Amino acid sequence: NSEIFKVCNYIRQKIEDQPNYYSVKPYCITLSGETDEKHRDYKIIEGKEPPPKGYGRRIIISTNVAESSITFTDLVYVIDTGLRYEKYYDPKKYAYVGGKVYIARANIEQRCGRTGRTNPGVCIKMYTKAQYENQFQQYPSPEIETADITDSVLRILNLPFVGGNMINAYKLLNQFITPPSKPYLDR
């Protein structure tokens, strides 16, 4: 979330540095999972309220919450970096780590689908066709492949038909549609 605030502040500063350049200044807003629906900026994002006086076009800097949880009215452009910040469990470190990762092609469709709902729109992709073809998976990885499953394994061990036996727990976990990867089970 801090990155979207930095980007929006950077845009605001650039707009303020050139006060005579814009006849109507763009209004920069951040959108994340923490954005309160009752906040005025949320109503501006949805197009239910206009930006403050002296501002025109909305610039919405968002986390991946914008992929599906909100409908934007009159959105003309989406600029997609093809990245998201993801936390995943590293079984070697026994801790969650995070970093920027490529999104899946399905996420790209969701992001680009935010525009063109009420009028024509454009999706600008900040990656090459080669990157798209070689580095983007078709669908996001199931969470069971990246999350700490310790609590789930402990619950499974308490199931009557598993009886606290780790071998039975392994057998059950390996029957999942997507079983957890071996490093997650071996710890």
Model-derived segments and spans:
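P-loop NTPase motor module signature
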Residues: 1-187
